[in-house]
Amino acid sequence: MSTKEKLISHVMKEEPVGSRSKVTVVGVGMVGMASAISVLLKDLCDELALVDVMEEKLKGEVMDLQHGSLFLKTHKIVADKDYSVTANSKVVVVTAGARQQEGESRLNLVQRNVNIFKFIIPNIVKYSPNCIIMVVSNPVDILTYVAWKLSGFPRHRVIGSGTNLDSARFRHLMGEKLNIHPSSCHGWIVGEHGDSSVPVWSGVNVAGVSLQGLNPKMGVEGDSENWKAVHKQVVDGAYEVIRLKGYTSWAIGMSVADLVESIIKNLHKVHPVSTLVQGMHGVKDEVFMSIPCVLGNSGLTDVIHMTLKAEEEKQLVTSAETLWGVQKELTL
């Protein structure tokens, strides 16, 4: 008898039980691994799968995570370059793609990453036909559109991480300026995750008190407190982190886990994520951008009708036109 047989007596033959909350992360770069560890530390899945074309790095990353299994509550952590390892995932987080270089706009990344998606998305669909795809790779809005087209999934099951992080940066910077915790500072960044994002100044509030009601010039030229600079810091934030450390990882990883939690736990929380906005707020083209959306177990269940000022709506349409200008040139 083996040591195991001497130690353990089976009471019953265990039937294989499928995963109820399996999460897959495609791409084990800095963002992928930050997303993976954030999901693990929030105890969001009963199985985590990692996929990448770089076999050595993939093997090293999964071993490193497995060695910490004692400190986690996720029973199974697996990895392979073959997409069969992702089978029956509830949520598939796509972080793979060419990395954004210092000074490079997210939109410049687009065609390189479209070609990568032509391989990734069909494989996800093959093994997890009922999953929710969450796109994180940049430019996220255009690549969410690409994933939607390539997958054939309904729009509620293809979500972009969008401006969830931009809004978190915005609230952090508001908190710094007011000396209040970010969770008590309420404000939304919508539109493109990137240079043409739109701060909804008319909705910024603390404890229900409209800050624009206190300072009507907030967010516009001539504001002595220069709140407009806060949005500029949001836009420049990622570029500055890339300049300083070479890449972004921790904040986007935590943002991904925040979104995954709302889906897995069916929280019905409202997040600014990238979805199809054609026909809303004056947007005519088939583009994906961030607006406040409700996330639950079925994916993106509802969109919130924002009350925007004319100037904010105009900026949102301009943001959509910026995305469409690039998107219409794509070869899918």
From Swiss-Prot:
Q: Which InterPro entries match?
A: L-lactate/malate_DH, L-lactate_DH, L-lactate_DH_AS, Lactate/malate_DH_C, Lactate/malate_DH_N, Lactate_DH/Glyco_Ohase_4_C, NAD(P)-bd_dom_sf
User: Any idea which positions bind NAD(+)?
Assistant: 29-57, 99, 138
Task: Tell me its family.
Answer: Belongs to the LDH/MDH superfamily. LDH family.
Report the locations given in the UniProt record: Cytoplasm
The entry's keywords: Cytoplasm, NAD, Oxidoreductase
Residues binding substrate are R106, N138, R169, T248
Per the record, the pathway is: Fermentation; pyruvate fermentation to lactate; (S)-lactate from pyruvate: step 1/1
Supply the SUPFAM superfamilies for this chain: LDH C-terminal domain-like (SSF56327), NAD(P)-binding Rossmann-fold domains (SSF51735)
PROSITE patterns with a match to the protein in the record: L_LDH
**Name of this protein:** L-lactate dehydrogenase A chain
What would be one Pfam family of this protein? Ldh_1_N
- State the organism named in the record: Lycodichthys dearborni (Antarctic eelpout)
User: A single GO BP annotation from the record?
Assistant: lactate metabolic process
Q: Which Gene3D superfamilies match?
A: Lactate dehydrogenase/glycoside hydrolase, family 4, C-terminal (3.90.110.10), NAD(P)-binding Rossmann-like Domain (3.40.50.720)
Q: Which reaction does it catalyse?
A: (S)-lactate + NAD(+) = pyruvate + NADH + H(+)
Gene Ontology MF, one: L-lactate dehydrogenase activity
Record EC number = 1.1.1.27
- Give an example GO cellular component term for this record: cytoplasm
